[in-house]
Design a protein with these regions (language model features):
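Membrane-proximal ectodomain caps of single-pass cell-surface receptors
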Residues: 1-318
Length: 318
């Protein structure tokens, strides 16, 4: 399918699932989805040609548990109002197992195809067990809003392949149910990996590669269990990487590069002095060597000065 998103769909008020992924829809994601389809639990529009911004009306979908807008051309910032997605922000424990409640009538069971933990899995289970948000591979800019940390019911989060900047919000570490902080990779994030990430005890997938992150990788059973590839393309140190840190938490190779640069400045100072001497010396000698008339004049002058000096010295002795 291609073209615009059909507006006739807004008449299906009882819809709880829209999956129009891998089509050729274009234009903006319709704002009326949040206005009219208030019972939506799953919204998957991945792998289309949607552009424009994420409509703030999406934040009105209080039952939404699976939002997938990945692989489109969506720009703008991540809406701060995402913390209003109450089904992603609420947890209930039943027999020590965490579920997310989204309707008073109970939990709806659906056969849902979701992209989770870096692979496609088909779940015959309550939707409350697979709450996820994937807005990867777009052109989103700005910072990750700290309000994302309120979505404590999320099990999977993927913001990779955008143009996001700034620090990673510390309160993402409060999302202790997170199993798959699938990807913050391939952005322009800076600062440190928040120490609170050591609280994410259920993580089985994690990737912050190819950003501008610096400092130490927080110590936890989970964070040290991932491969180096989860951290490459940054300026990080400590296990699982082989780079050690200085006492200030700076990777040693970065610190050494700084020292090398300072040493290079000193070396260049000496080099410039030597070059200055050589250039000055040859600036005087080269004309005498190559121009015969200058050479003869120089020797006559030198002979004249020598004779004059000798006469002065001899006169002083008398």
């Amino acid at each position: 399918m291609f073209g615009e998103f059909s507006s006739t769909m807004q008449n299906f008020l009882d819809l709880i699932m829209i999956d129009l992924s891998e089509n050729h829809f274009s234009r903006s994601v319709p704002a009326w989805i949040g206005d009219k389809l208030s019972n939506l639990v799953i919204l998957s529009l991945r792998s289309n040609n949607f552009n424009g911004h994420i409509p703030h009306k999406i934040c009105d979908l209080q039952f939404l548990q699976n939002l997938d807008l990945a692989h489109n051309n969506i720009s703008g910032v991540i809406p701060k109002c995402f913390n209003n997605l109450s089904a992603m922000a609420t947890t209930i424990k039943i027999n020590n197992f965490v579920l997310v409640k989204y309707v008073d009538a109970g939990l709806v069971f659906l056969n849902a195809l979701l992209v989770l933990k870096g692979r496609e899995d088909e779940y015959w289970s309550s939707l409350g067990l697979v709450t996820s948000m994937d807005i990867s591979a777009n052109s989103l800019t700005g910072e990750i809003p700290k309000e994302i940390g309120s979505l404590v019911g999320l099990l999977s989060l993927n913001f990779s392949g955008n143009l996001l900047t700034g620090n990673i919000p510390d309160n993402i570490g409060n999302m202790e149910l997170m199993e798959s902080l699938d990807d913050l990779s391939m952005n322009q994030l800076n600062g440190e990996i928040p120490p609170s990430f050591s609280n994410l005890n259920f993580l089985n997938h994690f990737n912050v590669s190819y950003n501008n992150l610096t400092g130490q990788i927080p110590t936890s059973t989970q964070l040290q269990s991932f491969e180096n590839l989860s951290y490459v393309g940054n300026h990080l140190c400590r296990p699982p990487l082989t780079k050690n840190c200085t006492s200030k938490g700076i990777p040693i190779d970065v610190a050494n590069n700084g020292s090398s640069r300072e040493g290079s400045k000193v070396n260049w100072l000496y080099v410039s002095i030597v070059l200055g001497f050589v250039m000055g010396f040859w600036g005087v000698v080269a004309p005498l060597f190559f121009i015969r008339s200058w050479r003869l004049a120089y020797y006559r002058k030198l002979d004249h000065v020598g004779r004059k000096s000798y006469v002065s010295w001899a006169t002083m002795d008398m």
